[in-house]
Amino acid sequence: MVAIVGFLMIIVIVFLLLRGLMSPIVVLAMIPSIAALILGYDPVTIGGFIKKGVETTMGNGILFIFSVIYFGILSDTGFFDVIVNFLVKKAGNNVIAITVATAVVATIAHLDGTTAATVLITVPSFYPVYKKMNISPKILLCLTGGCMGVMNLLPWGGPTARAATVLEMDATTLWHMLIPLQIIGLIINFVLAVLLGMLAVKQGAGMGKGVEDEVDEKATAEAEALRKPAPYLVFNLILTVALIGILASGIVSSYIVFMIGLCIILAVNYPNQKLQDKLIKKNAPAALIISATLFAAGAMVGIFEGTGMLTAMAQALMSIIPAPLGRYIHVIFGILALPLGLCVGTDAYFYGIMPLVMKVGETYGVASLSTALTMIIGKN
């Protein structure tokens, strides 16, 4: 009975998230609660499960709030625009330099971990250049996507934070295990940028009129008013590098790093209290939605474990999975991660499928951490 309710709950969660019928926050908190009620647990007990689960996500949720607002304000200062314009000008009419610059910008732009910001910074800036230089826009999308996949492994990136929530561990601790792979991924992306640039030259790129000296977006008056001069941008660069360095060292909790970092960047760049409030309100919605989703996922994980649904489902799957295959279940799902993620969506993949695969893997001697790392890497 417990396993059946668990499987039905997973199916409903995946269906609702895949069809976009409800907000992930509602789905992840409400559906498991209903499943627990069906299993006979009273509201007080369910509340205890939820409390325990949410407590494990607290650090990661707070990290998201401060990191997303920090990078949003960093973007408001014109930090990313300056980097884009500088690299485009330096690349000139050199096709390979343009593709490498694309990879650099996409990598830096995805420091905030949000897809929308990366695409809005990278694609509009480089698409006119690609068009004039007769470079296939597929290369632009390929490089942007590749760099986003690698940078998604940052602790405030969606996949790492979601997996850390399921593992009930700090996202920064999980990221430390992924740093070597992330470095290799960045190197591969830049090598790929060079190779795609060479391929574009063979296909006739660079035969256009060339890029113009000025590649500037038509920014609104409000955005222009927020832009800061060079000395501030240098300070912002040093601050950001310092924050990431402290995170990599692991000497301070990640959310504390960004909490202090946010205070510093606001105090230095925008010392006016009203303007500070305005910028926080501007960037807060995205941060709060992500954090609320993490807390809701924590509620789901708490109910999963408290009711024993996860264990019951794993035992049911063990009865139909051949033992020799079970030892490699993490590898199998690592290979299937990309198409599976595309089919069911990110939240359903990490909060619906990953916990079950981890539990099944445990019964065959595969550590949950190994399964999670494999599924994160495969997904990105």
Residue ranges, per PLM feature:
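Membrane-embedded alpha-helical segments and adjacent helix-loop junctions characteristic
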Residues: P43-K131, K274-E362
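Membrane-embedded alpha-helical segments of multi-pass transporters/permeases
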Residues: V14, A36-G40, L111, F190-V194, ...
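Interfacial loop-to-helix junctions that mark the boundaries of transmembrane helices
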Residues: M1-V2, R19, F49-G59, A171-P180, ...
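Membrane-core helix-loop-helix motifs of multi-pass transport proteins
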Residues: P128-V215, A221-R227, V366-N380
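Structural signal for alpha-helical transmembrane segments and their membrane-water exit/capping regions
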Residues: M1-I4, V12-T45, S67-G78, Y232, ...
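Long, contiguous bundles of hydrophobic transmembrane helices that form the permeation core
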Residues: I4-F7, L39, H176-L279
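Hydrophobic alpha-helical transmembrane segments
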Residues: A3-L8, V26-A29, G61, I96-A101, ...
